[in-house]
Structure formats: C-alpha cells, structure tokens
C-alpha cells in the first residue's frame, strides 16, 4: 500500500551542519535554565517560555540550516535514538577516572559513585563528571565539532560496542569517545555524556519540540516509532497527515490492538461479542510484532512500545534464536505478524513466568542454538496484519487467521500459532476458563469473529477473561514512581494519575457496565491522555531486587529533588500526611508493575496518601520499560475496579475509596442522600445551638460516607451555627454540641479535657424527627459517666427509646444485638502490625490436600500456623491451596481433585467466580524468607 507521504522527497539542508555547541546553547541550556530558575520577573508561564525557546530554535533551524532537523532531533531525544551504546553510569565514571589517571577507588571516584547523595537542584552525573574534568585541565580551544561530527562519533560508538565488550577499559581506548572528551567544550561535554547515557536532554519537553516542528509529528511518531522517517516525511507544516498515513507499514513499529478487561456476566460478554467469537489462551509473555521483509533477508522484532529487539531474536533467516525458524511459503515476500514472546522450559515442557523472556533469548544467543539451553524463547503468533504490500487490518479476524495458517508453518516449541476455537454462548466461555485454570494459564481472550484490527486501540472486539483469585486486588497495577525514602531498603512512593476535567467527569458516570453494547468501535483507548495531576497512593519496597534498585537508580539519577530543599509542585504532585524524603517529576521517572492483595483504608493509613486509601500487601512484579508514565493506572481506574476480595478487615471498595479530591472538594456520597436532604424543609431545629463537627460519618446500614462539610452544611440549613475553636470558651458550654464518630487526634484531646462527644446520628435523627431529641445511649460517642447514666434511663432493656418512634429495621437490629451473643469475631490486625513475621499469613486460610500420612504436609501446615495463618480441610473455605508433594503421581492426583472442584464452582456461577490460587510448597518458604507474600503465580504447580 503506497502512501501519499512515500512520494515526498527527503528534505535537504542548504547550509552545512551547525556546531554542536550552538545546539547546546540555543536549546539545551535555555530549557535547563527555565527548569532550574523558573520565569520569575518575565510575566510568562514556564510552558509558554518552553514553547518560546523551542519555536525560536525551530525557526532559526529552518532559516539558517534547512528542512532536515533529524541530526539535531536525534541528539535532543536520545531515548528515541535507535543507536545502542551499552554505557551505564558505573562504566562512564570508571572511564573518566581512568582518563584522568586517578587511582582505583580514589576519593574522587567514590564521590562520583555516590553522586546522588550530593547532587544539588538540577544537577546530574554528567555535570559532576565535567566538574572533575574542569578541575584538572583547561577548556579546549580546538576546532569546533559540528552536529554531524557528533552523530558520526556516536555511530562509531554504537558500532564497536560488541568489539571487546563494553567495559570502561574498552571505552577509555575508544578513539571517537576520546576525541569528544578531549575536544568538546565543558557545555558540550555535559550534554554529550547525557546523550550516551540516554538521559532526557530537554527534560520532558520532547512533545513541544515535535509539535513545533510539525503539528502531526508526535502522532506520526507514535505509529512509525522512527525519528528518521518522521523527519524525512514531515518537514513542511502545511502538508498534513491523512487517515491512511497512520496505518501499518512494514519495517516500522506500531502500537498494537489490546484486549479489554471487563467485569461483566458471561451473558453480557456473549452479547457484546454477538454470540460469535474465537477463544484463545492468554499468554504470560511480551507482546512482539515481527516484520518480515524481502523474503527473509531482513527481519525486525519490535515490542509493544516500539523497542527494537532484533538483536535478541535475529535479523534474517540465516541466524537468530527465532528468525531462523520462521517458515513461510515461497510466495511471501513481506508480512507483519502479531504475537506473544514467552519462555519455554524444554525439560519440564512448560511456559515460564514473563520475567525470563529476554533472559532466555540472551542465553540462547550465547549458545548459538536454542537446543543447547534448558529454556528458550517461544514465539506464539495469533494474527497476520500485513501481506505482500497490503494491509490486512480491515479484514475480519477469521479471514486473517486463515491467511496466517496458509502462509506460516509452525515449528513446535519455537514458533507456534496460537490455537483458537470458534465458540457460541455462555457455556463455551465457562468451559474455556476451566481449561485455562487446569493448565495454569493466565486466562483466555475472546475475539469477535468478524472484527477488524484496530491499531493503537483497546475496544470491545477483544475481551480478556482471567480467573478471579481470592486475596488479590484484580489486575496488577502499573504505577508511576513519584517519591523515595532511604533505609536499609529504599522504598518508592507511587501515584495514581488524575486525568483532565473532561475525561474525569466522563468516568464519573455509571460504571456498572464498562462495555457499551451499542457500539463496537467507540471504546478506543486514547494512548495520549492528558494528565492533570498525580495523587500519592502507596509505598513499595518488596519484590525489588538489588539489580532492579540499581537500574531504577540509573534511570532516574540526577532527577531526584530533596523535599526539604525543593517542595514538590502542588499543581503536579499531591501527597497525604506521608511526604517522601525525595520526589521526582513523573516525566523523568519510571513505571513499576505492582501486585496487591486488597485496598487498605484503615484509620492509621487512610490519611497517609492523597487517595485516602492505599494497597495492602503491595509487591513489585517488574519494571515496565515498555510503559509511558501517561499510560499508568488512573484514579478513575480505581473507581471502576472490582470489589475488594475476601479479607474481612476491608469493606467494599466504593466505601473504602474515600477518594476526596481536596482541590475540588468533591463528596463521595450517594444520590439518595442528596435527594433526602433536598426533600427536608429548611427549619430552625438547631436554633440557638453551636456545633463543632470533628469527623466524617459512614452510615452503618448503607456504607455511605457523609463528609464533615456535608454535616456542617446540613446543620446550618436547619438553624445551627458552626464554631471552630471550643478551647477559647467564647460561648456558653451548654449550647455547644461536639459531633464525631472517630477518635481523631483533636477529638481525643477534647475528650481528655472533659468534653462530651455526640455521634452524628443524633444530628440526622433530629432532622428526621423534625425536633430536638433527648440524648440516648446510641448517640453517646464518648461522654461522661453522669451523662451516660441519664441517657440509659431514656431507653428500655433492649435500647428502645421511651420517647421516639422506632423503625422496623432499627428494632430488628436492637433485637439481634441484645438477644443473640455473636461469636468472637476475627482479630482485626492493623496493617502496620501485619508487617511483623508473626502475622505474615494472617489473612490466609490454606487448604493442603493429603494423599498419605506425610511429614511434608505437617511441616507446611505448621509454617502457615506459626506465621499467623489458618488451615482448613475444605477447599470451599480456603483462599490458598498448597500442593505439598514432589512425587509426580501424588501431585497429579491432588491437582485433578482440586480442578474438579474448581470446575464445579465455575459451572454454578453466572459470572467469573473468585477462586483460590494453587501454589507449590516453595511459595511458603520464599514468602517467609522475604517477609512478605510473594506472587503466587511465580510458584505454579508443574510436572504433574
């Protein structure tokens, strides 16, 4: 398919390449100065100033250089540059120390290694390295180095990275690197170091630079993922893109179509897919697209985010861990495949967890054959999107599948086509989910039989159905790092995105059904969402290895700011009572995938974070290099997420979320309360009384949260007056009513001073009865013995008021509370206490199926009990199943029994049921060793 853009000739510059120093001073330095010093005294906003600097630079380039900005753009956006240097912080530090002839482990080298602790605002490793160089030599006055020269040196650096390994010993001997170090000015050198480290040179302003160059540049880059192509086609702002320009092009990465997660009944899912769909197994791997060109002479592998992994999987049919095993019919000149790269364990014949994918490819690469390693990459193909010059995306799914099967010959356990079966109706979904669970799979993907392929979308045509596991908070969350606290083990504070006003309001509607049955094409996820701010949500330390800590440090180094020195901007970051020691701009940060057991809004934790709730049992699964920070989990995603699982200490999620947007003073309160309040006439019930409201109130029967502001407004509407300081005693104490249902710090202080505290129910019941009612025991939150004695005389032995009428509901409640002795409830353990080893498994009820009398079983059960868990002999009552045996026959027998009971559970339910995770016994020991419950899916039961 030929695009109109293909006929556009490549732009040519009419002037020679400008100096690299000019690029640094006219663009990099000016943007850096605005970041550090702001725009005080100019009367301009930072955003306006950035646009002014960038637009001036773009205009100068067009007038003095020409229409080809690629040489400068690839230096300004180094993380978009496809050149790979394999130069990390440590290597660069050792290289510069060796170049300066400093002794090994010298004081200077140690300072540089610990540069993060001493860097100031706006500083980074590159600036510190230049400082050390400047102390020992004068600034060179040699001939200027042009932008083209720099790109030539970077080409050489990238080309020789495999020559003798990329260590500091080889880098210090590299001629292009040494030439730059010895001949660049100090300003140039700083940005040269940033470029080879792949740091963000213009600090999050890349989109402004792209938009200033061409209004469609950013959109086109999201489809093409290649700066050179973007700049060669889009250099005239008057020439705009057409819709077909944003289609798939062989050789260029694109954003794939994604499956949508829904929380609907099987019946509604079927209706959404028109009762005609293909069922595929959901793979636990990395989304990879294969671009096959010129009969296999050139092959490229791209990730979902356009990262080029060709070096891992092979560049042609002649070599590579995957590419040499691609078998197409002779008629295939070029094509594009969509699929999942997983790791296959050749010995156990199972697919391994996601994190091993690239590691297996590297190991196979070093052995030159996947037959020589225990585990290796396996490419599972599920779609064909392009064939011999024609895009197949408009074709129906079943037709694309037919073409795929006709042109590709699978090779078992290396390149396979994902099996799919055409299904109709509810029972087929249940059956496919049963099979997925029995195989230990992630779940299934249901695809509308006649659906087209929509690039960069997530719509109703593809729906993923995953088993719902007890003691887990739905899907894993992709969260952005916004803060850091040091300790024996660093902990990172993570945040939720708040989208712009329009999208925020859109998500406040009825979310009971996420899928719109009336349209299959409307629900396309916008990959470029506008983020208004970020709210602190949780802190995570568990699950991050030392290597990952180092990698996070390397990626974010130089971008952290100490909170004590520079306050985080309230317009971007909002924290609760817990403020991190350091914070980071989200555009400079990194995304982590977090697994959690449930939400936690206990009294001790709800104030710590801006969301008024946090995660319980959070655990880092991995670093999401493929995720942009703007695509992370949002506040609205949290609203739409399912009810918190079985942990009894947590309430239903909607009441948990106390997600009060402080800026907008939103109130999470049901429409029914608003309607009831509006129906109440304005009265003088509270005339002459003064009220001091100390807390919100959550109604016992419905779980509706009535905020402090709502209570105050209601009191005023009915004649009461508000005061905000009781201690001053400017009013008659007999006229004052203190209202609270929580022992806040202020409330406790007033109790200690002898004040009586009434429950908010008294206010609401006064309004309901349309008069002041006497104080009775149920209205006494914390009062003196004298007042309580008087109150108790106003009710009978059941607590029924002698004066006020009682509703049927309240009478039933009183009867049950007085005449039945409830069994001892579960011990509610504060989330802080749960961190102690004694309570590690306090939320677990484990089932250990037995096939013989064995010490293995006894030891597992003993460990669960020792660390606060419980054991049950009924699978239906558990939230964790542990298969104890190493013997394959016994293990298989246990698993068959477990799966039969799970199948019965699925058949009996109209929606996706919540089931217990099944784990190998190693899960218990690993959890104890790490002092946290490690992810269950990392310990599947295999070899049965």
Swiss-Prot record:
Residues 681-780, 836-941 form the BRCT domain. GO terms for cellular component: DNA ligase IV complex; nucleus. Component of the DNA ligase IV complex, composed of DNL4, LIF1 and NEJ1. Interacts (via BRCT domain) with LIF1. Interacts with NEJ1. Interacts with POL4 in the DNL4-LIF1 complex. Belongs to the ATP-dependent DNA ligase family. GO terms for biological process: cell division; DNA biosynthetic process; DNA recombination; double-strand break repair via classical nonhomologous end joining; double-strand break repair via nonhomologous end joining; maintenance of rDNA; nucleotide-excision repair, DNA gap filling. Mg(2+) 2 binds at residue 442. This is DNA ligase 4. Mg(2+) 1 binds at residue 340. It catalyses: ATP + (deoxyribonucleotide)n-3'-hydroxyl + 5'-phospho-(deoxyribonucleotide)m = (deoxyribonucleotide)n+m + AMP + diphosphate. Its EC number is 6.5.1.1. CDD domains: Adenylation_DNA_ligase_IV, BRCT_DNA_ligase_IV_rpt1, BRCT_MDC1_rpt1, OBF_DNA_ligase_IV.
């Amino acid at each position: 398919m030929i695009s109109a853009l293909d006929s556009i000739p490549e732009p040519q510059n009419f002037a020679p390449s400008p100096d690299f120093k000019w690029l640094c001073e006219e663009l990099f330095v000016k943007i850096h100065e605005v970041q550090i010093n702001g725009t005080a005294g100019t009367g301009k906003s930072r955003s306006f100033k950035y646009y002014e600097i960038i637009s001036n630079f773009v205009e100068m380039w067009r007038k003095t250089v020409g229409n080809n900005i690629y040489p400068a753009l690839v230096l300004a956006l180094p993380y978009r540059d496809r050149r790979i240097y394999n130069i990390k912080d440590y290597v660069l530090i050792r290289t510069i120390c060796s170049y300066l002839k400093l002794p090994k482990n010298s004081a200077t080298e140690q300072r540089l290694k610990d540069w993060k602790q001493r860097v100031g605002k706006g500083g980074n490793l590159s600036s510190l390295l230049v400082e050390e160089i400047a102390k020992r030599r004068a600034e060179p006055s040699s001939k200027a180095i042009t932008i083209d020269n720099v790109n030539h040196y970077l080409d050489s650096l990238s080309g020789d990275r495999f020559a003798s390994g990329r260590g500091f010993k080889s880098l210090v001997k590299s001629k292009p690197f040494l030439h730059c170090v010895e001949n660049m000015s100090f300003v140039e050198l700083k940005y040269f170091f940033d470029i080879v480290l792949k740091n963000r040179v213009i600090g999050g302003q890349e989109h402004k630079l792209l938009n200033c160059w061409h209004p469609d540049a950013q959109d086109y880059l999201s489809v093409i993922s290649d700066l050179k192509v973007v700049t060669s086609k889009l250099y005239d702002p008057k020439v705009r893109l057409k819709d077909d320009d944003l289609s798939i092009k062989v050789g260029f990465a694109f954003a794939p179509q994604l499956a949508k997660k829904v929380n609907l009944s099987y019946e509604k899912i079927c209706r959404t897919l028109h009762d005609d769909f293909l069922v595929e197994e959901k793979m636990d791997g990395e989304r990879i697209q294969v671009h096959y060109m010129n009969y296999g002479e050139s092959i490229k592998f791209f990730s979902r985010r356009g990262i080029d992994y060709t070096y891992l999987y092979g560049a042609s049919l002649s070599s590579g861990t995957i590419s040499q095993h691609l078998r197409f019919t002779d008629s295939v000149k070029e094509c594009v495949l969509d699929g999942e790269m997983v790791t296959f364990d050749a010995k156990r014949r199972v697919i391994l967890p996601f994190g091993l994918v690239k590691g297996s490819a590297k190991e196979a690469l070093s052995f030159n054959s996947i037959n020589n390693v225990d585990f290796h990459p396996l490419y599972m193909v599920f779609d064909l999107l392009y064939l011999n010059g024609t895009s197949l995306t408009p074709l129906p799914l079943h037709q694309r599948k037919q073409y795929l099967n006709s042109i590709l010959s699978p090779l078992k356990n290396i390149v396979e086509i994902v099996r799919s079966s055409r299904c109709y109706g509810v029972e087929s979904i249940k059956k496919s989910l049963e099979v997925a669970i029995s195989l230990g799979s992630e779940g299934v993907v249901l695809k509308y039989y006649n659906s087209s392929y929509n690039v960069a979308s997530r719509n109703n045509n593809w729906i993923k159905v995953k088993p719902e596991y007890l003691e887990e908070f739905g899907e894993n969350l992709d969260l952005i790092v916004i803060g850091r606290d040091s300790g024996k083990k660093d902990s990172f504070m993570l945040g939720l995105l708040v989208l712009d006003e329009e999208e925020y309001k859109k998500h406040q509607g009825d979310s009971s059904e996420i899928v719109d049955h009336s349209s299959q094409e409307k629900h396309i996820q916008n990959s470029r969402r506008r983020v208004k701010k970020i709210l602190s949500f949780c802190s995570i330390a568990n699950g991050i290895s030392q290597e990952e800590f180092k990698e996070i440090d390397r990626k974010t180094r130089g971008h952290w700011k100490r909170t004590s020195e520079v306050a985080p901007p309230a317009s971007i970051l909002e924290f609760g009572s817990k403020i991190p020691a350091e914070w980071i701009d989200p555009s400079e940060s990194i995304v982590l995938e977090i697994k959690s057991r449930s939400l936690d809004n206990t009294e001790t934790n709800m104030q710590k974070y801006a969301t008024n709730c946090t995660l319980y049992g959070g655990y880092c699964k991995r670093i999401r290099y493929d995720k942009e920070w703007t695509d992370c989990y949002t506040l609205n995603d949290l609203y739409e997420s399912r009810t918190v699982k079985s942990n009894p200490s947590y309430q239903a999620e909607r009441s948990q979320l106390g997600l009060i947007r402080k800026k907008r003073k939103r109130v999470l309160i049901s429409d029914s309360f608003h309607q009831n309040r509006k129906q109440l006439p304005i009265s003088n019930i509270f005339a002459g009384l003064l009220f001091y409201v100390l807390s919100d109130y959550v109604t016992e029967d419905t779980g509706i949260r009535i905020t402090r502001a709502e209570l105050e407004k209601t009191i005023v509407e009915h004649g009461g007056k508000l005061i905000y300081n009781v201690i001053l005693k400017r009013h008659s104490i007999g006229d004052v009513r203190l209202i609270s249902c929580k022992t806040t710090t202020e409330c406790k202080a007033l109790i200690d001073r002898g004040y009586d505290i009434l429950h908010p129910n008294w206010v609401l019941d006064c309004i309901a009865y349309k008069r002041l009612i006497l104080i009775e025991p149920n209205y006494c939150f914390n009062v003196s013995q004298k007042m309580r004695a008087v109150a108790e005389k106003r009710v009978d032995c059941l607590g029924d008021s002698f004066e006020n009428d009682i509703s049927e509901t309240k009478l039933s409640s009183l009867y049950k509370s007085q005449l039945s002795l409830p069994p001892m409830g579960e011990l509610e353990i504060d989330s802080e206490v749960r961190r102690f080893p004694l309570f590690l498994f306090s939320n677990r009820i484990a089932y250990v199926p037995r096939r013989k009398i064995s010490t293995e079983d006894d030891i597992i059960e003993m460990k669960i009990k020792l660390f606060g868990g419980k054991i049950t002999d009924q699978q239906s009552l558990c939230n964790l199943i542990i298969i104890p045996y190493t013997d394959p026959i016994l293990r298989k027998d246990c698993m068959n029994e477990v799966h039969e009971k799970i199948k019965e559970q699925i058949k009996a339910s109209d929606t996706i049921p919540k089931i217990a995770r099944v784990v190998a016994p190693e899960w218990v020991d690993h959890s104890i060793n790490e002092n946290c419950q490690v992810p269950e899916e990392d310990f599947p039961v295999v070899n049965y």
